[in-house]
Amino acid sequence: MKKFRFFVSGMPGVGKTTLAKRIADEIKREGFKVGGIITQEIRSGARRSGFRVIALDTGEIGRLAYVGQGYPRLGRYVIDVESFEKVAIPAISRALREGDLIVIDEIGPMEFKSNEFLKALGLVLRSEKPLLATVHRRFVERYRPLGEYYWLTPENREAVFSEILVKIKELLRENENAGNKAQD
């Protein structure tokens, strides 16, 4: 299996999570196994009140962050490390074992409050599994050298979606064919 990683970054609200979810859904429709996590905003009216993490394979939901009192903090958010790890770490572990594609949304400062997440991310980056990850803009330079990198904008998001989707499909088909040849 050939190593291939896709990293997507951009400003908040540009559509990084939407892109990751759309690609995951398309790859699943092709019959491949997709695992990992998606992070979504929690809103109270027009205001963001936190973030949840969702396991792509099971749909299990955990809380990543909320507005309130407590520690650890990032800005106005309290990071719920325990709830995040309860969903994210098993989801990433399953993706490493069983998935054809690993999706991690997001590699960012909230997630970095979890040492277990950092360990799991290290395992993913050392693995042979294809990876699609969204990266907080502060961490672009750290991850840019590790794979193909895209800066998402409202103007290019459809083109970036199409380009990454085509490349991942090609990669997964190559890996599938290589696996079939090895079994012959």
UniProtKB/Swiss-Prot annotation:
At the top of the EC hierarchy, this enzyme's class is hydrolase
Q: Which cysteines are joined by disulfide bonds?
A: none
Top-level taxonomic group:
Archaea
- Give the Gene Ontology MF terms in alphabetical order: ATP binding; ATP hydrolysis activity
Q: Write down the InterPro entries for this protein, in alphabetical order.
A: AAA+_ATPase (IPR003593), Nuc-triphosphatase_THEP1 (IPR004948), P-loop_NTPase (IPR027417)
What does the similarity note say?
A: Belongs to the THEP1 NTPase family.
- Name recorded for this polypeptide: Nucleoside-triphosphatase THEP1
Which organism is the protein's source?
A: Pyrococcus furiosus (strain ATCC 43587 / DSM 3638 / JCM 8422 / Vc1)
